[in-house]
């Protein structure tokens, strides 16, 4: 899809940044509800696996990135380091502590839904790699209790949730469901899959003329509208999606807003720098949607994919830590996510 690709040198640079991130303990943004003074502890005490990479969810998807790179390039020069790091991190005794944190009365909604979606995406990647890699099978087995817990929690939450969150930040409903759907398919989790499909249709199935002119918000790293479209593509067959898209797509003037990369004016600001993530996630969305779009729009989608990548791809490895602790994962989604996956 265009001239940009996840070439070997790019994969190596992503591997190096991810390896550095998952082992970097500080700075760390701890999202922690304390019930008493006894709950004060260093992040690693609560999160022995996901205590690096600035925050919990970024650590999770940096682990996913490493697994994905192993799947894409098993002979990568950094592969031995990746395997050693994952072997040290993804151990049953460590995952048991992570699971216990989610089972605390005050932590039941911790990282919902973004971190939940990424953890399920990580487990989906481990399960896929485990089909041909015995070492990955041990990592998948170690992570299974946490993934199973979050799958049940997410299905229960979806049964009770009435309204979606459409903002393009960590609380976005559609993005979490796209990530979780990968697990539901790979693990053949029919309960979760049905919950996702049912809620996606109820939340987004009747949307029309999406107001793309209202995007983006100043700290958004997701397009609420494009991400919603990726979700609906994942839960519909081709004909149904084509009919849905015809009603959903913004008018031509507004659609141009999604086709043009956003300008990032302050890359040292943790919130403003989210806009680099928006460029990369839009590229991912266009990659996933392009084959299912009407013929006149497909060349525009390919051009948008390329333009958005060129605008922000360098920040994944060359930017400040507020960017490099997370952007490479979205770069790989945009460059190498299986279409329809």
Segments from the language model and where they lie:
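Well-ordered alpha-helical scaffold segments within catalytic/enzyme domains
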Residues: 2-6, 63-76, 117-135, 176-188, ...
């Amino acid at each position: 899809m265009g001239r940009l690709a996840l070439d070997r040198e790019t994969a190596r640079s992503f591997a190096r940044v991810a390896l550095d991130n998952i082992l970097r303990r500080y700075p760390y943004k701890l999202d922690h509800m304390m019930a008493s003074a006894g709950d004060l502890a260093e992040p690693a005490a609560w999160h022995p696996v996901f205590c690096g990479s600035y925050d919990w969810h970024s650590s999770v998807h940096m682990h996913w990135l490493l697994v994905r790179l192993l799947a894409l390039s098993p002979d990568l020069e950094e592969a031995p380091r990746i395997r050693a790091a994952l072997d040290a991190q993804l151990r049953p005794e460590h995952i048991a502590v992570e699971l216990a944190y989610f089972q605390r009365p005050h932590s039941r909604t911790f990282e919902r839904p973004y971190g939940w979606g990424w953890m399920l995406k990580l487990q989906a990647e481990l399960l896929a790699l485990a089909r041909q890699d015995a070492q990955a099978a041990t990592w998948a087995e170690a992570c299974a209790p946490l993934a199973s817990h979050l799958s049940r929690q997410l299905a229960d939450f979806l049964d009770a949730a009435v309204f979606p969150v459409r903002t393009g930040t960590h609380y976005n409903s559609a993005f979490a469901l796209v990530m979780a759907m990968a697990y539901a398919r790979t693990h053949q989790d029919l309960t979760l899959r049905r919950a996702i499909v049912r809620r996606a249709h109820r939340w987004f199935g009747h949307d029309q003329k999406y107001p793309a002119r209202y995007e983006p918000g100043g700290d958004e790293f997701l397009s609420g509208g494009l991400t919603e479209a990726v979700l609906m593509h994942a839960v519909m067959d081709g004909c149904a999606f084509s009919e849905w898209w015809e009603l959903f797509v913004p008018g031509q003037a507004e659609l141009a807003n999604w086709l043009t990369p956003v300008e990032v004016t302050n890359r040292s600001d943790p919130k403003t720098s989210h806009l680099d993530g928006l460029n990369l996630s839009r590229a991912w969305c266009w990659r996933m949607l392009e084959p299912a779009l009407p013929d006149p729009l497909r060349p525009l989608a390919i051009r948008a994919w390329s333009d958005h990548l060129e605008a922000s791809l360098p920040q994944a490895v060359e930017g400040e830590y507020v960017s490099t602790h997370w952007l490479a994962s979205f770069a790989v989604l945009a460059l190498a996510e299986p279409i329809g996956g």
